[in-house]
Amino acid sequence: MERCSRCHHLLLLVLLLLWLSAAPAWAGTAPVDVLRALRFPALPDGVRRARGICPADVAYRVSRPAQLSAPTRQLFPGGFPKDFSLLTAVRARPGLQAPLLTLYSAQGVRQLGLELGRPVRFLYEDQTGRPQPPAQPVFRGLSLADGKWHRVAVAVKGQSVTLIIDCKKRVTRPLPRSARPVLDTRGVIIFGARILDEEVFEGDIQELSIIPGVQAAYESCDQKELECEGGWRERPQRQPSHRTQRSPKQQPPRLHRPQNQEPQAQSTESLYYDYEPPYYDVMTTGTTPDYQDPTPGEEEGILESSPLPPPEEEQTDLQVPPTADRFLTEEYGEGGTEPPAGPYDYTYAYGDDYHEETELGPALSAETARSEAAARGPRGLKGEKGEPAVLEPGMLVEGPPGPEGPAGFPGPPGIQGNPGPVGDPGERGPPGRAGLPGSDGAPGPPGTSLMLPFRFGSGGGDKGPVVAAQEAQAQAILQQARVALRGPPGPMGYTGRPGPLGQPGSPGMKGESGDLGPQGPRGPQGLMGPPGKAGRRGRAGADGARGMPGEPGVKGDRGFDGLPGLPGEKGHRGDTGAQGLPGPPGEDGERGDDGEIGPRGLPGESGPRGLLGPKGPPGIPGPPGVRGMDGPHGPKGSLGPQGEPGPPGQQGTPGTQGLPGPQGAIGPHGEKGPRGKPGLPGMPGSDGPPGHPGKEGPPGTKGNQGPSGPQGPLGYPGPRGIKGVDGIRGLKGHKGEKGEDGFPGFKGDMGVKGDRGEVGVPGSRGEDGPEGPKGRTGPTGDPGPPGLMGEKGKLGVPGLPGYPGRQGPKGSLGFPGFPGASGEKGARGLSGKSGPRGERGPTGPRGQRGPRGATGKSGAKGTSGGDGPHGPPGERGLPGPQGPNGFPGPKGPPGPPGKDGLPGHPGQRGEVGFQGKTGPPGPPGVVGPQGAAGETGPMGERGHPGPPGPPGEQGLTGTAGKEGTKGDPGPPGAPGKDGPAGLRGFPGERGLPGTAGGPGLKGNEGPAGPPGPAGSPGERGSAGSGGPIGPPGRPGPQGPPGAAGEKGVPGEKGPIGPTGRDGVQGPVGLPGPAGPPGVAGEDGDKGEVGDPGQKGAKGNKGEHGPPGPPGPIGPVGQPGAAGADGEPGARGPQGHFGAKGDEGTRGFNGPPGPIGLQGLPGPSGEKGETGDVGPMGPPGPPGPRGPAGPNGADGPQGPPGGVGNLGPPGEKGEPGESGSPGVQGEPGVKGPRGERGEKGETGQAGEAGPPGPKGPTGDDGPKGNPGPVGFPGDPGPPGEVGPRGQDGAKGDRGEDGEPGQPGSPGPTGENGPPGPLGKRGPAGTPGPEGRQGEKGAKGDPGAVGAPGKTGPVGPAGPAGKPGPDGLRGLPGSVGQQGRPGATGQAGPPGPVGPPGLPGLRGDTGAKGEKGHPGLIGLIGPPGEQGEKGDRGLPGPQGSTGQKGETGIPGASGPIGPGGPPGLPGPAGPKGAKGATGPAGPKGEKGVQGPPGHPGPPGEVIQPLPIQMPKKTRRSVDGSRLMQEDEAVPTGGAPGSPGGLEEIFGSLDSLREEIEQMRRPMGTQDSPARTCQDLKLCHPELPDGEYWVDPNQGCARDAFRVFCNFTAGGETCVTPRDDVTQFSYVDSEGAPVGVVQLTFLRLLSVSARQNISYPCSGEAQDSPLKLRGANEDELSPETSPYIKEIRDGCQTQQGRTVLEVRTPVLEQLPVLDASFSELGAPPRRGGVLLGPVCFMG
């Protein structure tokens, strides 16, 4: 036997060496588990565990927000293999088309990828760019996105790629790559996504591996697997566990034994080979020699498994009890078939790196091939923690796997020991064949597992001793380890049977006072009693019952929020809600359940060996033991019958209290139980809601006047009566004490108008109420007296545009305004001429250190550096401090419904809720024992009248009465007295215009009215006849330059003048007259109230209004006489309830009975409990003004205040962050004159010189071409308030309005009176005499007793202390306008309010005064082709030009009319002689006139061309066309060139408009979509503010942004710091709409925004959190798109600047930034946001 064992050792060593020598070239490159490399087991954001292909497998569910990537070099440090296999097990979301894995180079080129969906794409591009995209392999007709699990293998070899799906489909496609393809590993590998692509992988993945060579892909299907249920299966490579794994490997060359040798059994001792690729601990076996027919009896268990077909559906995992040196045993048939030579590895790991959660389902126990015939036991309950096991000989109990330890180096095989002496036969035989175990309970926490190689005896010798030395050693070590097999708590048991009935409890404590009972029936109306003494201050009473429905009132103000509604029925369990904001830290909870098993810890140091412990108590039965020693082979037995179930086990220790189970379904209704005894009277319930009103009874006949009854309780308010006659004024009563303010009552009817009160202190302005609905139009009332000056109203709704008004007169000069805010930076001016170079100044002193410069632009990306040498491993650092809590992650997918939690602490007693709906009948309770009879309690106080009795018996049906005849109409009633004045009706609809009245009498001559507005300019008059020539006037001032005329015909040659010097710039021209009226603007803000108008004439008497509200309650009447005393009647016994009768008709009110006699005073009773709240007393008189209350809570944000006075200058702020590039600066000041330079070379012809002295007035020149359209000017300042207009005439009285619509039905009426008592029922059987009952609970308050005799009036008590302020009452009706209060002292200037919303566009203001000359604006876009302008005034005579070239001979001109003779002009300077020109054609002879005198200078400046009325294209002056084109013959027949000019002008204008649409200019009228568009159309534009309209369409919603052309055309929107979050506005402060921002994102590729914050303590204590526009939370720790471009916190000074630059455009702009929880009150700590810039 020893020799045989050594043979095995040698054989295994030879096999191992052969395997190593035959290993392929990539043996140095290990297989790569991509999931482990991307840290899937750590469950990063967007990844959570899920069930794999088999219930026990672990897969990972990947959702959209996951961002999983790693450097490629980290996975493939030795380079990416040329030929490789890619294996995965995946289940993708149905309909998905997304990448599973993408590998990028360092330059961002996609080199490798697998895209799932329909079709499946394999992407590959080597260093030469091959294959080209058209040649990329596409597997059409295949889909991996169908929601099912698929095993996918991709084999890449040479020039082809093969796709294997589920071991069934195998498709090969060509892959034309280069001969030596190389993939760059300096980039990144990304799971489930592509850069700048929105499609991401969503689904489950169990395995993703890349293995060098293609064998792994083909052999992945050669392995045989059974179904998940009940057999062996392959564990995926990426889940090392305690289970044996098989992984495909290269087939080593087999050994062939010589034919003459006997086959030798393989050694059962495994050989460890320390092969440690990253992420794997692999144990390899040798390969069995290739032989046939092993001899029975010699065969031992081996590690390979026979090939089986691949699984069809689910596969389950297998847990193998480790045996001594046998990790897997399979049985083969008697024929001794060959176990396959194994092309497999076996991965074996100590401990448990296999994190399995309870939700994955229980792991299934091992089921061997021959145990299939055994009976399957029932599923066991979850076990409790067992006691430490006692290991019997031959048994080894294995706990669940512990954490995975590191693989040790293999030791050399030990020498086989000598067999021990033959011992006595052991008592215990080998265990029998195990039956099918029941389903495991949930796994317990991990125990300790030890694998010890036991010695095997020889197969043929006698049976040796059961316990060998090694086994005894194993038992000792196992006893020290105390294998822990405690499981988690078992499931909750079933509900137990009801316990026996308990004894009756002891009498309880006296209960609290009951709530106020129901309100009694309404008493008769009593006489008005005398004024009583002031009562003690009562508690607020409950609301009274609902009154009779009144007439519909006017719509009231918005009410307070209503009370909560009745509790609804319990709904179904809702979906899991979105993750809420983190709440405040709670109190320490109870100790939680055991957490998940943590990651593998570092191996600890070996401890000293412990002493042998005492023998433990017997444990619970363990799993099936190890297989016993083989006995001599007996004949195969037949299958035995199923064994009987064993005896029940010992009672386990009770488990810990389980969590409450979920609420069960409602059970079926039980049978009706026996009638219980009447229970104790319950506590009085809270007031119920008012009942429905009863039917209105018929009116009764009027009864006789009965004697006056006692004063009853205050009844409900009666219906509104007609106004009675005024009674006698009663005596003034004593002033009562001030009562507490009651709860606010319902809103009463409007009272009559009170007397005018004294002038009150001006109150603070109340909050604006909500806008009420528009009322119906009432009749036009008389004009009222002039109102007082009201406060300035809020900004109204913009009205319709009015008609254009006439031009008003110029307003008087206003007061100087406050200094305005800094204006926006002006446009770039024209560059000035460079000044002469100055002399060199003296050297200045050394300047101070400048501030820190702005961060420069990011430099170009450097080339990737080479790998540095690996440094030595550092010492293990101390554990760092606990970091701050991370941000809440994004919202995860809905988790499974959680278990019901423990019941919470009982809350405080809630207020009495509304009456709930009648619940379903509860199940009958357990019948309690009959209680002892209680003692007879004292007689309770008289209770309230009981509820209405049950209906009486059915009365006899009366005979139907005859229908009465219709009565005659009664006489007309006398006209009633005038009712009180009614409420003012709604204004009626506007009446039709009345007929014109007759001419009135001539009135007195009124005072002179204010000057009327300037009239509109009249039409241009016809030209007057020419006057005589006036005397020559004084030379006029220099006139403005005229518009440039069209180029004239070359003139005759003039004399050459001397060259003039450069002139100075001329003065600014005069302002032009006002332009035509503009389009009517939108309504402006409400102006200041004007002075009160004159008193209007007295109007006609109005019609009677509707009846007014009822008047106030009259004074208290005199006390009536006391009635006679009545005798008290005997109290009768209380009858039993009869059967409920039908509701009878309502009886008449009986007369009040006489007053009873005064009863004797009763004995003084015990002090009662505190009474219930009484009904609400009448409101007391207003108390004195209380002291000022504490400051109230912060109210809602008020409307924006007006702009306050300019505040004092603030302290110097911190340096701001680097802003966007500024606009180009203004030109610098002109430099000093330089020294005289040398004479230059002859220059080109200079420009026209400065204007010369004014020449004589020339003829009108032709109309010039229109100039370019300028930028829109700023709106002028508003004009001053004009003088007050005269009062308007009195309007005619309008017609009566139409009758109103019927009102809505009133509320339901009150409950009817209680019905009569039913008939008395039969007497019940007498009950047993009860015991003395306990003291009863306090009875309901008795009925109101008869009033006592009126006592004498007591002395007035002292004034009570002022009560606390009551609750705020409902808003009262609007009072009259008070007198104006005295002018208060001017308050201090308020803080500057936030900038208000932009106002509506105002009316066109009056023409402003002439402004200062503006800076020269930017060159505007070319304007539309205008019509030809009118002829301008003659310009000043220019300096003499250089001699022109000889012109072309002109055509002969027409003969001109003769001019009047003029005076001879002064002789001009002699010009240079010109070159002789060619002879012109002979002109027609004109009438030669003598030269005329120069005309007088004009007094009136003629309109400049820009001031002429603008002509439309359709109003071209034909006569002007004739003048302007002298070649046109007079008459201008149709079809002449003059007729075409209008057509060409229109075409030109159309062309320019289209050009503006194609090439927008960035103005308000021609906005671009983005700044990128502007840059493309006008690359010469400088950085600055321009108008954009991303959504196109109407340009009214365009907004102004900063265009950063320097950065490539970024569109930048500026934020505004609001109270709760940042909002985004354009350059003028108007908010940018959400739609415009959305379009801006759609038009952009990326966006960036800077955030800066000071380095305060808060910034260092808690991280900055940002909330993006898509509500996602961003932080520098979690987002890869946030870069820190300046860190001022390292130096403890300055600010830190972060830049968010993201392709996920939905994340910007940032809406909130805080160091606290987002959405909480902001703790921004000085956070500043820069503009958000979108790059198109």
Swiss-Prot record:
Record flagged with keyword Secreted: yes
Positions of the UniProt region annotated as Triple-helical region: 487-1500
Signal peptide span: 1-27
Residues listed as glycosylation sites in the UniProt record: N1604, N1650
Pfam families to which the protein is assigned, alphabetical: COLFI (PF01410), Collagen (PF01391), Laminin_G_2 (PF02210)
Domain Collagen-like as annotated: residue spans: 399-447, 487-545, 546-587, 1072-1127, 1128-1172, 1444-1499
Composition skew (Pro residues), residue ranges: 400-413, 615-624, 1029-1040, 1176-1187, 1388-1397, 1457-1467
Cellular component, GO, one term: extracellular region
UniProt keyword annotations, A-Z: Calcium, Collagen, Disulfide bond, Extracellular matrix, Glycoprotein, Hydroxylation, Metal-binding, Repeat, Secreted, Signal
Region (Disordered), start-end ranges: 229-465, 485-1539
Positions contributing to Ca(2+) binding: D1589, N1591, Q1592, C1594, D1597
UniProt PTM comment: Prolines at the third position of the tripeptide repeating unit (G-X-Y) are hydroxylated in some or all of the chains.
Chain intervals with Gly residues compositional bias: 994-1003
Top-level division of the source organism's lineage: Eukaryota
GO process annotations (BP): cartilage development; collagen fibril organization; sensory perception of sound
Biased composition (Polar residues): 258-270
Record text on subunit structure and interactions: Trimers composed of three different chains: alpha 1(XI), alpha 2(XI), and alpha 3(XI). Alpha 3(XI) is a post-translational modification of alpha 1(II). Alpha 1(V) can also be found instead of alpha 3(XI)=1(II).
Domain notes: The C-terminal propeptide, also known as COLFI domain, have crucial roles in tissue growth and repair by controlling both the intracellular assembly of procollagen molecules and the extracellular assembly of collagen fibrils. It binds a calcium ion which is essential for its function.
Role this protein plays: May play an important role in fibrillogenesis by controlling lateral growth of collagen II fibrils.
Name of the protein described by the UniProt record: Collagen alpha-2(XI) chain
Organism: Bos taurus (Bovine)
